[in-house]
Amino acid sequence: MLGMAACAQDTKTETITVTNEVFPACDATHPTGQCDAGQICFEAECVDSATLCSPTNLTGACTAGTICFAGGCVLETALCSPTAPTGPCELGSVCVEGMCVATASLCSSSNPTGTCAGDLTCIDGICGTPEVDPCSVHVYTTQPTVVAKTATSQKAVITVDGLQFKDLSGDGALDPYEDWRLLEICRAKDLVSKMSIPEKVGTMSEGSRVGSGTEDGTIPDNVTAAIVEKFERYALIRTGSRTPQQLAVYLNNVQELAETQPWGIPVTITADPIHGFGLSTNNNTGEQSVNPSSVVSPWPYPLGLGAINDPVVTRQYGDTVRREFRAMGFTWQLGPMADIATEPRWARVQNTFGVNAYAVAMHTRECIAGFQGTGVGGLPVGIAATMKHFPGAGADEDGMDSHSYSGRYNVYPGGYFEYHQIAFQAAIDAGVAAVMPCYSIFKDQFEYDPEQLAAGFSATLITDYLKEEMGFTGMVTGDWGTLGHKYNAESIPTPLRAAMWLWAGSHQFGSDRESNFQDAYDLGYITEADIDGAVEKILEMSFKLGLFENPYVDPAAADVRSAANLEAGFIAQKKAIVLLANAAHEQSGNQATKFLPIDGSRYKDANDDSTPQVGEYLDDTNNDGTIKVWFDGVVDRLVADPEKPDDMTSVAGYGEYDYTAAGSATSLPIVQATGLADADIAILRISARKGSYFGLDAGVPLSFDGAFPGQSNDGSIRNSIQDRNRVIDAFRARDGYTDAAGTAIAATNPNLRIVLVMHFDRPGIVKPFINGLTTLDELPGEAGSYPLVSDEANIEQGRGKGVDAFLVEFGAIDRAVLDFVFNQNVPTSPEGYRYGEAVLPMEIPSSDAAVEAQFEDVPADTVNPTYKLGSGSTL
């Protein structure tokens, strides 16, 4: 079933046929030349994009000498074989000594009698020889950096066999858990054997008691108590209030405190994904803002990486996160999300890679490789990745979320449960360090969840399926407050639920009281052996990260928002923009004018004299010899506001932006318009209506003003109505309307062209803006009112009265949007790149009714979507 057919996601290209713009056609001389829409230049010929190898066409065409494998073209000689002993294998398999072997068949804690390489035998999940204890074998030989804060902790660096080790126990001898030459699970077993029950229970907790850092690096008393009295060693940090350098200093001090404790167990610091950012609209003023992290470099959402659909970019993103996290002292991320965004109302689709499970698998694999340092040193220089939310949170009933009781079910009316496992299997094959189960009950999936409990409490899901069938061998960590999300277990006492968590095969709990697990032990629900097994897997991850040798970082070197990182994220922001419409709203036939990119020299030669004249310039819609552009963005200017610098202002080669132009003999000047009334072109930035995954009893509609169908309070509509009104105001300026008193208000600018840019954190229903509205009038007697865009009767059924261009972004500063629409600062890699190569990683439905009728688990299945999965075109 994991081979279920993929949904279509085509790459689209279009030619630009403007007199003074020449793009060479695809041929042997121009192997990256232009082709018709829906085609791409492939080996000097134009071919249909859908015929090429991709995650959506697993048998597509590749260049000579390569074959289509797992959705990508690879050299046949590079596949797993005796001559390529580390080559790729099919999903669910890994290369062992040149042969593809099922991941789940390998020797591990999940399969204690599994397969080992060579002549080795699986002994209790560890490969070795029967006559030698595998936990006594020195498998690592390269000396790592060992750092001890001896002056404070009284823990010394000792020398054994000419090698350095950290005397974490302070006994002057080399204990097995201090010996970095041994397997990590063996070190963990030795350490666990020395710990008390309270120490073990504290280790099982992943909470936020370490705080968010302090300005001067001092450790608050409550943090000291968490480490010293509660024995907590796994902590989530919320960033935002401290600089990277302050965090590095603070966390060094936290590590130094931990080193002073009896076993010297370091603290493993984690964070949620923090590199993406969004656009929001103030529901009172209509003012817009972007909210990138001030601590790390801003990148587009993972959904934007899915739109770019380039594994190189996704690996670069993962590597950037790794380096920036490590520089601050973070060594674990609660990501990436391997969920499939098949339910478009879900509030978290922007944090997935899309709806195509094979594409999501590719991006998940590359992201994990970037996080975990694959190819550059592995976990000792990486951060532990956490695939979530197993076995998939994307099929939420009615688009709700299991953070809330009403959204406790994931449903599969289309029978696509196994489709949602494809990316998780890819993550397991890639060696992902941890997994976070979903809060949800997987409704009626009795084969996988016969207990009908939240995933982390289901032994069938966690042990039988995740570990034994899929081959996962890492640590199972809980989502926040797992014991409180007690769906179908409400009548079970909390200590017994804690026991059920361990019985299922889960290991660590998030933000739950340690006393619940201590009570489970004291009441006899769980044994010390149950606790030991969990703590061993938790500590194994920290040993793999190299923290027991050196958990410290250099604050002076914590150059997190470096120029290189900012530029890489900025380029990705631009590459993720998808162009979905680029033609005048009064288009007729197939010869509509494409007026993007905005350029003072673009014209159509109306009189065949090969000389541009006033009236022929494409972007001078008012024919007055000047192109006036109104930009309604975060900062409503074509020229940077020095009082509001963006992320790129301080980066060499960028500085303050200016998209105005003086003009020349063959080009018109471009100036800032004062508003809609005098603009040739208006660029409006809006945000799709926000979802919510807390406290709602129904899915939030995707339309900008559709009524919330539940009884709880959905505040998103106030913000989205502000954006709706801004679009209608532009329509009214162009087309006129009738006010509440019945007075006809004439158009103030009938030649206005409108570019709509939507921030895509959910697929907002834009059909009313694309097709246009049948009425722009105020409601009789209601001054200042606007027509409902969620009312199908108010929407034109054919296109012609809507916006002139439409594009979506997945996290972009104003400069990224303006670079795109003005076709400036085009990325130079890959060779021949053009803006607009990204395509939609999920469809944009046409109505709330179409969304309600689709199946939550099936990808891209709404009727007559406004834009299909894979839509997009180049400038």
Identify the role of each PLM range.
Residues 11, 19-20, 56, 110, ...:
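Generic cytosolic/nucleocytoplasmic N-terminal low-complexity/intrinsically disordered segments
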Residues 14-133:
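Secreted, cysteine-rich disulfide-bonded mini-domains of extracellular proteins
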